UniProtKB/Swiss-Prot annotation:
Record-annotated DNA-binding residue ranges: 54-129
Subunit structure, interactors included: Binds DNA as dimer; homodimer and heterodimer with NR2F2 and probably NR2F1. Interacts with THRB.
Statement: the UniProt record of this protein carries the keyword Transmembrane: no
Primary location recorded for the protein, binned into one broad class: nucleus
Domain NR LBD positions: 157-380
Molecular function in Gene Ontology: DNA-binding transcription factor activity; DNA-binding transcription repressor activity, RNA polymerase II-specific; nuclear receptor activity; RNA polymerase II cis-regulatory region sequence-specific DNA binding; sequence-specific DNA binding; sequence-specific double-stranded DNA binding; zinc ion binding
Function: Transcription factor predominantly involved in transcriptional repression. Binds to promoter/enhancer response elements that contain the imperfect 5'-AGGTCA-3' direct or inverted repeats with various spacings which are also recognized by other nuclear hormone receptors. Involved in modulation of hormonal responses. Represses transcriptional activity of the lutropin-choriogonadotropic hormone receptor/LHCGR gene, the renin/REN gene and the oxytocin-neurophysin/OXT gene.
SMART domains tied to this protein: HOLI, ZnF_C4
Protein known as: Nuclear receptor subfamily 2 group F member 6
Location within or outside the cell: Nucleus
Positions of the UniProt region annotated as Disordered: 1-50
Region (Important for dimerization) location: 314-390
PROSITE patterns for the chain: NR_LBD (PS51843), NUCLEAR_REC_DBD_1 (PS00031), NUCLEAR_REC_DBD_2 (PS51030)
Length: 390
């Protein structure tokens, strides 16, 4: 297994630091495999296809899509190598730097995968720099009126993408649950969580570029990223989503044989609360939340995407928008962009199963939350939400 660090190093050693570009924060359990036959991705000089010639990827053994960066590779290994070089990523092996890299294990250790890319002859100098972004003019103050805790933006105009992300924000009302300092009971906590989940899906439905994607891609992206989006929404909510009432209720029903399991569960719950609190301490504004959610949503590593390269380009658009926005709005905080981006891998470390068990077990029982999300996404406003809309 590998963990992402920053800077880029060759196959001979690690570099320390942080992931400067955030990457698509690769998931060890998800396959960033090749695009389906017929899908196209941006070509680089030296890319060469051989129609009718069956050649295996020299990195992982999957079916190659042509010659990329000097050798025959599949689309998955091509994209992995391009992403690593463009974003100046490096990785650390958690084993002995000799992990097996094949079609079924290529995503389990990015360090050894990159090492093999170099060993078989992939050339970093063949990777072109990413496209140079052009900021689009937008309204100077595009914060939705009445958004709790959000001040209108001052200074340079924000990009049109950020303006669209802000318009997609549902901003759930706080009045039903009292003020920001209110202590909610367990029923109210579960209800607020349900509304945040619904808001997560509604935000995605109205996020720029998302509605134009095939329905299967929409479902795949949201099923993969819903837990990260939920934590971001929980941190952004006008009413804090505290876990203390749920922990207290869990403690009352914990049997003596479940003590060890309960300790592990509570550690995970504290990790969830810690991520929410860290986002609060960063004082993330609405535009930054929108960009972070878009980066999390458009992950090209989701399985079964019809065009992973297109999804990756959408993620890059959101990342560029965040970079430009932070540089313009917070010129005195040069580390802010890196601190924001580092929140995303940390959010991914909060298990989706924990969020489902903690907040939604009382609501949906054993129904997988991913099934509920799919139904919510495809049904739209006609979805029969248990808590209603009042």
């Amino acid at each position: 297994m590998a963990m992402v660090t920053g800077g880029w190093g060759g196959p001979g050693g690690d570099t320390n630091g942080v992931d400067k570009a955030g990457g698509s924060y690769p998931r060890a359990t998800e396959d960033d495999s090749a695009s389906p036959p017929g899908a196209t991705s941006d070509a680089e000089p030296g890319d060469e296809e051989r129609p009718g010639l069956q050649v295996d990827c020299v990195v992982c053994g999957d079916k190659s899509s042509g010659k990329h960066y000097g050798v025959f590779t599949c689309e998955g290994c091509k994209s992995f190598f391009k992403r690593t070089i463009r974003r100046n990523l490096s990785y650390t092996c958690r084993s002995n730097r000799d992990c097996q890299i094949d079609q079924h294990h290529r995503n389990q250790c990015q360090y050894c995968r990159l090492k093999k890319c170099f060993r078989v002859g992939m050339r970093k100098e063949a990777v072109q720099p990413g496209p140079i972004p052009h900021a689009l003019p937008g309204p100077a103050a595009c914060s939705p009126p009445g958004a709790a805790g959000v001040e209108p933006f001052a200074g340079p105009p924000v990009s049109e993408l950020i303006a669209q992300l802000l318009r997609a924000e549902p901003y759930p009302a706080a009045g039903r649950f009292g003020g920001g300092g209110a202590v909610l009971g367990i029923d109210n906590v579960c209800e607020l969580a349900a509304r945040l989940l619904f808001s997560t899906v509604e935000w995605a439905r109205h996020a720029p570029f998302f509605p134009e994607l095939p329905a299967a891609d929409q479902v795949g992206l949201l099923r993969l990223s819903w837990s990260e989006l939920f934590v971001l929404n929980a941190a952004q909510a006008p009413v804090p989503l505290h876990t203390a009432p749920l922990l207290a209720a869990a403690g009352l029903h914990a049997g003596p044989m479940a003590a060890e399991r309960a300790v592990a569960f509570m550690d995970q719950v504290r990790a969830f609360q810690e991520q929410v609190d860290k986002l609060g301490r960063l004082q993330v504004d609405a535009a930054e939340y929108g960009c972070l959610k878009a980066i999390a949503l458009f992950t090209p590593d989701a399985c079964g995407l019809s065009d992973p390269a297109h999804v990756e380009s959408l993620q890059e658009k959101a990342q560029v928008a965040l970079t430009e926005y932070v540089r313009a709005q917070y010129p005195s905080q040069p580390q802010r962009f890196g601190r924001l981006l580092l929140r995303l891998p940390a959010l991914r470390a909060v298990p989706a199963s924990l969020i489902s068990q903690l907040f939604f077990m009382r609501l949906v029982g054993k129904t997988p939350i991913e099934t509920l999300i799919r139904d919510m996404l495809l049904s739209g406003s006609t979805f029969n939400w248990p808590y209603g809309s009042g």
